[in-house]
Regions:
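NAD(P)-dependent Rossmann-like dehydrogenase/reductase catalytic/cofactor-binding core
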Residues: 45, 49-144
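Active-site-proximal catalytic alpha-helix in oxidoreductases
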Residues: 2-27, 32-45
Length: 144
């Protein structure tokens, strides 16, 4: 369960960062934003693999490699950004649970401190493009 939760965080956090970057309106995200999101997920997965955390679900990392599974993931990300159900699953959750998102972010960054020199350029770029957690709390409040 521990490994699954870590990989879940690795997948969710780039979505969270993009949500906050776009003011919780993923319709504002560009194709380049969504590519950056998937590259950031890949960075986070590689970090966990570097920490010897077993991939859970088994084989999930293959969905980030070129091929049919990756095409499906891109389609899901596009749907998440362009549909009401996608907004409900992502932006509404970020809007109403900023404390939870910040806690998840803090916990993941604690893991990253174990390998401080491990390169995660896309993950760090997307993180740097969102408002600070202080700004997010001011905008959305502590609705956890």
């Amino acid at each position: 369960m521990d490994a699954w939760l870590k990989y879940h965080a690795a997948y969710i956090l780039p979505i969270v960062y993009l949500c906050y970057k776009t003011g919780c309106d993923l319709k504002k995200s560009t194709r380049q934003d969504r590519k950056l999101l998937l590259d950031a997920v890949r960075d986070a997965y590689h970090m966990l693999m570097e920490l010897s955390v077993p991939v859970r679900p088994v084989g999930d990392e293959k969905s980030l490699e070129p091929g049919f599974a990756n095409w499906i993931v891109k389609l899901i990300i596009y749907g998440m950004a362009r549909t009401r159900i996608g907004a409900l699953c992502t932006t509404e959750h970020c809007r109403h649970a900023p404390g939870e998102m910040e806690d998840l972010d803090s916990a993941f960054h604690e893991l990253c401190f174990e390998k401080p020199n491990f390169p995660m350029p896309y993950f760090n770029q997307l993180y740097s493009e969102m408002p600070s957690w202080n700004q997010i709390r001011r905008i959305y409040g502590e609705k956890t």
